Amino acid sequence: MRRRSFLLLFGLLFTILLPAQQKLSSRFRANIPLDSIRLSDPCILADKKTNIYYMTGTGGLLWKSQNLATWEGPYRVTEIDTASWMGHTPDIWAAELHEYKDKYYYFATFTNNAIRIDSVKGNVIPRRASHVLVSDTPDGPYKPMKDSIYLPAGMPTLDGTFWVDKDNKPYMVYCHEWLQNWNGTIEKIELKPDLSGSVGKGKILF
C-alpha cells in the first residue's frame, strides 16, 4: 500500500513539475535519427541561448536536438484561441520559429475546414490564413496575441514567413493562394513592433 501511495505521489509531482511547454505527444521518442522523422515543410531554429536546435513544420509539432543528427519529440507547443476563427482543431501547415527582440514567434498557416469563405471554378475555399503566436521560450507554449486576424478574412493566405527590412520594420511575407486569384501572388504586410498584429494593407511583391 505504501509503495502504491509513493508511486502515485511521485506521478502527481512529475505532472506538476513538468513545464507547460513539455506536452509530449503519444508518439514521443528520444534519440530519433533525423532521417526517421517524416515532416513536411521543416524549419529549424538554432537557438543561441539554449544551444539547442528546434524543428517544426506542417502538423504543428516540435522536435529538439543538440547535434542535428538525433532528435527527441514530438512535443505539442501551440495553444490556440478556440473561440476564434481557427476553431478547436485547425490544420497547421508550414510552421516556422523566429527569435525577435527576446521573444519567440510561431508563424504558421491555420485552416478551419468548417468555414467556407469562397468558391472559385468549382473549388471550395476554406478559412485559411497565415498567423502568428508568441512564447517566452523556444519550446513554447506558443499562444495568441492581441489580434486574431492579420490578413483579410475573405482571402486565403498561406506559408507566411518573417522578414525585417533595412529600416528595421518587421513584415510578414505570405502567399495569396492561387485557388482564389487563379495565379497566386507573393505579398508582404507590415507588422506591429511586437508582431501582435498587422499595419495597413498587404502589398504584392510578385
List the model feature ranges, each with a label:
Residues 1-24:
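Bacterial Sec-dependent N-terminal signal peptides
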